[in-house]
Amino acid sequence: ALVTQSNAPSWGLGRISNRQAGIRDYHYLSGTSM
């Protein structure tokens, strides 16, 4: 959730929206990273 933010700016926006849910952040990057 720190190295993918610059690699995936699209999911980054969603991460900011779900910043309250840190666990959801991992799910987001996991789906885009893989």
Curated annotation (Swiss-Prot):
Keyword Protease: yes
Temperature-dependent activity: Thermostable.
Keywords for the protein's UniProt record, in alphabetical order: Hydrolase, Protease, Secreted, Serine protease
Keyword Membrane in record: no
Active-site residues, record numbering mapped to chain: S33 (charge relay system)
UniProt record, GO biological process: proteolysis
Gene Ontology CC entries for this record: extracellular region
Cell compartment(s), UniProt: Secreted
Enzyme Commission code(s) on record: 3.4.21.65
Reactions catalysed: Rather non-specific hydrolysis of proteins. Preferential cleavage: -Ala-|-Xaa-, -Tyr-|-Xaa-, -Phe-|-Xaa- in small molecular substrates
A GO term, aspect molecular function: serine-type peptidase activity
Described purpose of this protein according to its UniProt entry: This is an extracellular proteinase with a general specificity for apolar residues.
Family, per entry: Belongs to the peptidase S8 family.
Name by which UniProt lists this protein: Thermomycolin
Source species: Malbranchea cinnamomea
